[in-house]
UniProtKB/Swiss-Prot annotation:
Signal peptide: none annotated. GO terms for biological process: symbiont-mediated suppression of host NF-kappaB cascade. Contributes to virulence by binding to the host IKBKB subunit of the IKK complex and preventing host NF-kappa-B activation in response to pro-inflammatory stimuli such as TNF-alpha or IL1B. Mechanistically, sterically hinders the direct contact between the kinase domains of IKBKB in the IKK complex containing IKBKB, CHUK/IKKA and NEMO. This is Protein OPG200. Belongs to the orthopoxvirus OPG200 family. Homodimers. Interacts with host IKBKB; this interaction inhibits host NF-kappa-B activation. It holds the Pfam family Poxv_Bcl-2-like. Keywords: Early protein, Host-virus interaction, Inhibition of host NF-kappa-B by virus. It comes from the Viruses.
Amino acid sequence: MTANFSTHVFSPQHCGCDRLTSIDDVRQCLTEYIYWSSYAYRNRQCAGQLYDTLLSFKDDAESVFIDVRELVKNMPWDNVKDCTEIIRCYIPDEQKTIREISAIIGLCAYAATYWGGEDHPTSNSLNALFVMLEMLNYMDYTIIFWRMN
């Protein structure tokens, strides 16, 4: 019997970056980040300064959503619409604060990590990405750009 080891390390474009150069890169960077979060730690590239900043958004998720780990476990991640409605119970305004925006990103990153696969994302971890994309708009990307840099 032989052991089967994965040698693939997921390495998205912005993972090793220190900052973004354009607001237009924010959505792509966040998409890559949530996707990256779906991989097991040993199967993804080490985070650079930019991703370290994004990882800190989990702290905002804990302050906005309180018991974020329980929320991540109990939300119906197989249903994007229901998840967005649950988040809107915590963050009802269309005009979100910078802390609320980063909390949404942090919550979805928690979910992607919790529900992620060993060497590839799962349907639930991908739905965490879709929830984030559903919750954020261009104004949110513009606001969060300044915190990311």
